[in-house]
């Protein structure tokens, strides 16, 4: 089912740790649970921070229309994006956002953005209908002013997209995190298929499963590997002593 999906993870992350542990009897959990991130740059597989949507960006499809509450959960936004023509969308931002964000400025330097002095000019750059895109942006700006999105129920209205030039980044959904992995106990000891500890084998971080359930919350992987990493390090040290 994942054939053709890109991933934000490093090329060297291929599940080797899980395979090595399985070779000596380790059990796994939640191996069917993955997290898809909706804003992965279409050509490079680079993660485009969701902070842009929180700061006011919108997503439009190939018709130049919004199709989802952009700040909904990653799985919901990704599913809506995958259902669009071509399974991709355009992340729309304006100059005001660019001026306020070194991150966006970095995206521009990397060549991820298309630019237009007007909504219609940007639409021409990205191959969507100019009138439709202009109407979408104008409508969205009205929603921001009214603090109400009757189309999709978005409740985040940080700022309007009203400062030219306008920019677009082509994004698609990509595998961002795998919730499944080695089954461990609270001391980070890896368990076998009978639920028994495998002596001397400890694991922490994304190689493990059962920590995040079916869908990881943004940012919690950091607390996962920091907390369980420290526990695993101390436990391994105590075991070796």
Tell me the role of every PLM-derived stretch.
Residues 132-215:
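A glycine-rich dinucleotide-binding beta-alpha-beta segment and adjacent secondary-structure elements
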Residues 18-132:
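An anion/pyrophosphate-binding glycine-rich loop and adjacent beta-alpha core
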Residues 22-29, 65, 124-131, 135-146, ...:
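Generic secondary-structure signature for well-ordered alpha-helical cores
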